[in-house]
UniProtKB/Swiss-Prot annotation:
Molecular function terms from GO: oxidoreductase activity, acting on paired donors, with incorporation or reduction of molecular oxygen
Protein name (record): tRNA uridine(34) hydroxylase
tRNA processing in keyword set: yes
Entries under Pfam families matching the protein: Rhodanese, Rhodanese_C, UPF0176_N
Gene: trhO
Species per Swiss-Prot/TrEMBL record: Chlamydia trachomatis serovar L2 (strain ATCC VR-902B / DSM 19102 / 434/Bu)
Record-level GO BP terms: tRNA modification
Amino acid sequence: MEKNYYALAYYYFGPVSNPYEEIALHKQLFKTMDVSCRIYISEEGINGQFSGYQPDAERYMAWLKQRPDFASIKFKIHHIEENIFPRVTVKYRKELVALGCSVDTTKQGKHISPEEWHEKLQENRCLVLDVRNNYEWKIGHFENAVLPDIETFREFPDYADRLAKEHDPAKTPVMMYCTGGIRCELYSALLLEKGFKEVYQLDGGVIAYGLKMGTGKWRGKLFVFDDRMAMPIDEADPNVSPIARCSLCNTDSDTYYNCANTDCNNLFICCESCIATHKGCCSEECSQAPRIRAFSAERGNKPFRRKHLCPTIEQSCCLKEQENQPA
């Protein structure tokens, strides 16, 4: 019998009295469930991405909302066909979002609903700022958004300084967005510290916008840090036209792969034809390399984990598994 699964995205910024106890309780609960996840908990809150068999996911949501520290948490839910993380990971992380500097999160931009966001986009009055990494917005973003060429979130504090020099903070209203909302909690506070007076953030991020408004003013797909790699923001509109191009032949494509050359492992966009021709590699040079993972079109573009590296040799070349940057 076919099983239905949920993908959950959620976070909460607020004091957590005993994060290690919460971690232990999570792990104990998950022992009896058909789930996979990547959850970080600290004294400042929780940042979670979760997948699970529907009854188990519903049980977990009800359980978490009964925890005193997490009663106000909001879940964003998508229907999926299987678990989308390699394992259950619940761990302590002091910085829920790796910004690299401290900010006063008690002072944040104004949260606006997906409906309000959609209306403001049509006013064309604000600077619309994408605060995700460049490889994320490359396959999807809002119309007319400013797309910083940033590889990691730790580069955004320097970008904020540049933004304050290029635009008058007192006169430039800013609307910012990220995948699920958590990065905006920090970056909106940072822009306020830089002197920006009118700062808005999309409540629940792009995920919430898609659930409420459909495709709307969004173009392309949404990059996600799980086995799907990318997803349409509207479940009812899965056939989204690519806005990116294959890095090898320049045809339209929005599919990311990790290079099958284990000494490269580069994340790149590729079409079906080129990925087959180059055996899962990002270049002709890599396709001739000595340590190549076996490529299978049936496996699709799921990210490679440690267990997939160098199946015929000692796993001395294991590369660091890409850690999820909070949404």
